[in-house]
A protein has these predicted regions:
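Loop/turn elements at helix/coil->beta-strand transitions in domains of secreted/extracellular proteins
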Residues: 48-52, 83-88, 110-112, 119
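A short beta-strand-turn-helix
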Residues: 32-52
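Bacterial Sec-dependent N-terminal signal peptides
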Residues: 1-22
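Non-catalytic, surface beta->alpha helical segment in thiol-disulfide oxidoreductase systems
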Residues: 109-154
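Thiol-based oxidoreductase modules, predominantly thioredoxin-like and allied folds used
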Residues: 32-34, 74-97
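Conserved redox-active cysteine motifs that mediate thiol-disulfide chemistry
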Residues: 56-72
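N-proximal helix/coil linker or "cap" segments that precede and/or mark the start of modular domains
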Residues: 18-32
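Electron-transfer interface patches adjacent to heme c in soluble/periplasmic c-type cytochromes
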Residues: 103-109
Length: 155
């Protein structure tokens, strides 16, 4: 019985420690290393069978704040994001444009911009978020269709 308890405790502790390795950012931070953040996101995505969304923008960007609020406050969107995606904020600002990191992806025309990656970090899609806008917010149906199109297949 003690061996079973010890095994379960170690298994739980290992899962807890691994889960602590990836912590989503709440803000765009010019001091963060996007390569390190992506590496942690890939590890987490592989263990949870999720895709990754690189959310490129900055604290200066009003639409970046609008999309954050929309994703957080729209129940159906938040549910899809929580179940199928790992979000990584990539800063683009005058303090740090992360040009070297972003040079490995297609050119961006505006912010915020999403890159959808599979759990191994392979680019699946480049999304101009302007296509998801509606008036001064985002279109729930378009956003849900986008998330459903690029979510991973669960095995």
């Amino acid at each position: 019985m003690k061996k079973i308890f010890l095994f379960i405790s170690i298994l739980f502790l290992g899962t807890f420690v691994f889960a602590q390795e990836y912590t989503p950012q709440e803000k765009f931070d010019p001091d963060r290393n996007p390569n390190d953040d992506l590496k942690a996101a890939i590890n987490y995505a592989q263990s949870t069978n999720k895709n990754i969304i690189l959310d490129v923008g900055g604290e200066w960007c009003i639409w970046c704040h609008r999309i954050d609020a929309f994703m957080h406050n729209t129940k159906e969107v938040k549910s899809l994001l929580d179940e199928y995606y790992v979000i990584v904020k990539i800063n683009f600002s005058k303090e740090n444009k992360n040009e070297k990191f972003l040079s490995t992806y297609p050119a961006i025309e505006g912010y915020p911009h999403f890159f959808v990656l599979d759990k191994n970090g392979k680019l699946l899609h480049s999304q101009n978020t302007g296509e998801l806008e509606k008036d001064k917010d985002y279109d729930k149906d378009k956003f849900i269709a986008f998330l459903n199109k690029w979510k991973p297949t669960k095995k």
